[in-house]
């Protein structure tokens, strides 16, 4: 499920985080329609044979808030 968050930063699938306080994390979320406008490093890649976009920033508390409700 790809979701374009309205409030940013948010992340459903957290990547790696630093040990700093607060932690600076990457997010593994991808979207077929592009990154959030605030993302300054949006990369287009292929996943499962389709083009997707991934924000490759390391942001403080990136994984603190989900973009979509937890299941």
Curated annotation (Swiss-Prot):
<feature type="site" description="Reactive bond for trypsin">
    <location>
        <begin position="19"/>
        <end position="20"/>
    </location>
</feature>
<feature type="disulfide bond">
    <location>
        <begin position="14"/>
        <end position="63"/>
    </location>
</feature>
<dbReference type="InterPro" id="IPR035995">
    <property type="entry name" value="Bowman-Birk_prot_inh"/>
</dbReference>
<keyword id="KW-0646">Protease inhibitor</keyword>
<comment type="similarity">
    <text>Belongs to the Bowman-Birk serine protease inhibitor family.</text>
</comment>
<dbReference type="GO" id="GO:0005576">
    <property type="term" value="C:extracellular region"/>
</dbReference>
<feature type="disulfide bond">
    <location>
        <begin position="35"/>
        <end position="42"/>
    </location>
</feature>
<keyword id="KW-0722">Serine protease inhibitor</keyword>
<protein>
    <recommendedName>
        <fullName>Bowman-Birk type trypsin inhibitor</fullName>
    </recommendedName>
</protein>
<feature type="disulfide bond">
    <location>
        <begin position="11"/>
        <end position="27"/>
    </location>
</feature>
<dbReference type="Pfam" id="PF00228">
    <property type="entry name" value="Bowman-Birk_leg"/>
</dbReference>
<feature type="disulfide bond">
    <location>
        <begin position="10"/>
        <end position="67"/>
    </location>
</feature>
<comment type="function">
    <text>Inhibits trypsin but not chymotrypsin.</text>
</comment>
<keyword id="KW-1015">Disulfide bond</keyword>
<feature type="disulfide bond">
    <location>
        <begin position="39"/>
        <end position="55"/>
    </location>
</feature>
<dbReference type="InterPro" id="IPR000877">
    <property type="entry name" value="Prot_inh_BBI"/>
</dbReference>
<dbReference type="GO" id="GO:0004867">
    <property type="term" value="F:serine-type endopeptidase inhibitor activity"/>
</dbReference>
<feature type="disulfide bond">
    <location>
        <begin position="17"/>
        <end position="25"/>
    </location>
</feature>
